[in-house]
Amino acid sequence: MGGLTLFAAQGCKAPKQVAEQAEHPNIIYVFPDQYRNQAMGFWNQEGFRDKVNFRGDPVHTPNIDTFARESMVLTSAQSNCPLSSPHRGMLLTGMYPNRSGVPLNCNSTRPISSLRDDAECIGDVFSKAGYDCAYFGKLHADFPTPNDPENPGQYVETQRPVWDAYTPKEQRHGFNYWYSYGTFDEHKNPHYWDTDGKRHDPKEWSPLHESGKVVSYLKNEGNVRDTKKPFFIMVGMNPPHSPYRSLNDCEEQDFNLYKDQPLDSLLIRPNVDLNMKKAESVRYYFASVTGVDRAFGQILEALKQLGLDKNTVVIFASDHGETMCSQRTDDPKNSPYSESMNIPFLVRFPGKIQPRVDDLLLSAPDIMPTVLGLCGLGDSIPSEVQGRNFAPLFFDEKAEIVRPAGALYIQNLDGEKDKDGLVQSYFPSSRGIKTARYTLALYIDRKTKQLKKSLLFDDVNDPYQLNNLPLDENKEVVEQLYREMGTMLKEIDDPWYTEKILSDRIPY
């Protein structure tokens, strides 16, 4: 297990806490940042490799691999707007970026991008249902304001624009236990604000520190939770998010697994450019992947030792992926490429969810209602939620439920700015759709809002998206994709629908 001793002596087992099992199960949602679906070792193992048409990354993830064999594993979960804050807005609210309040990455120049105070978020629902709710790690869903609890009237950091943020109690949406921050990318020098607003600077690689705090919470050290209630835990780990360029960013024992490996044995995807400067980063990225696996394993082991594993739904996911030299792009995310959009989504619920692999096209706004459904709270899903509850499918693979035809792709950029440089609107630069077979993305000109670029890939015959198909040579396919995309954009009241963008092509 490395990095954390769960219990002092082998002969001293922790007290079983089965007595606290309630009508509703416990739930733990772990979502490391920028963790792509391909970066899990089990994809290269028997029982999994024949379920996908890509090669998994050569990563060491023993805990996730074991967990996968106990879980329902999705091959095609999608981060519809594959960027930190917009995904988190969708995750927490069950709404797309135009409704969640978070269309852009949150920083102090973007007052228009912040989680809505009036939204009924996933923590609100669990709290009202009698859960003890705890949030650990990165949040990155709030507009930073000068509200440093230790320095009133000041921001929590001096750099401009301000990215990091303190979330006061009235904005925590049902989470009664808090050990979190906005966003901060010094992985071995993290900081957190606790429930009472006190800052902690642990000087420890952040995923391992967070897993230790989760274990402490599970063991109820310091009497921090009500053991008569079921718990809902979210763990937002920052790695393997960049930076990934030195041992300041990962644990040396994890880096040692990759440091002597040739780059072409690590970056194995056919769409990779090994000549990119970023290529050397793969060793550190994979090291962080392995470190996250170790931290995740510590949480799983604690559940088992405490007798909580049988009545706890555990989900492993991410907010978006990482291109890592694929498609010759320096942008690790915010694109329709599979390395960016396709995220892990593994769900374990012993005795309730049969371990298997499924190709459900799960969208980010579907996660909140589905998680509530898994816990028997389907009737408590807020009316504003735009996502769908797919819990019946998790419980029964033969459930009569209409599967989604596709998942939307959304990219927004900064729009108009005021005289102080504050962003007052967002520009809906691209929309697209991912279906079981195709990926389509349309990009528009900022001034004319006319089509300036398109991407169309046959993901079945071209899984690494090497061949961008011309729209005019694939009219029948494109028209069907336009119809499906238009229907979905209309359903969520997206700006492309309200402004009738590219209405000469898309039949809204």
From Swiss-Prot:
InterPro entries: Alkaline_phosphatase_core_sf, Sulfatase, Sulfatase_N. Its EC number is 3.1.6.-. The keyword Hydrolase applies. The conversion to 3-oxoalanine (also known as C-formylglycine, FGly), of a serine or cysteine residue in prokaryotes and of a cysteine residue in eukaryotes, is critical for catalytic activity. GO terms for molecular function: arylsulfatase activity. Keywords: Hydrolase. The keyword Hydrolase applies. The modification 3-oxoalanine (Ser) is found at S84. It comes from the Bacteria. Endosulfatase involved in the degradation of the glycosaminoglycans (GAGs) chondroitin sulfate (CS) and dermatan sulfate (DS). Efficiently hydrolyzes sulfate groups from a broad range of substrate size, including disaccharide to high molecular weight CS and DS polymers. Has a strict specificity for the 4-O-sulfate groups of galactosamine. GAG-specific sulfatases play a key role in the persistence of the major human gut symbiont B.thetaiotaomicron in the host gastrointestinal tract. Belongs to the sulfatase family. This is Endo-4-O-sulfatase. The lineage of its organism: Bacteria, Pseudomonadati, Bacteroidota, Bacteroidia, Bacteroidales.
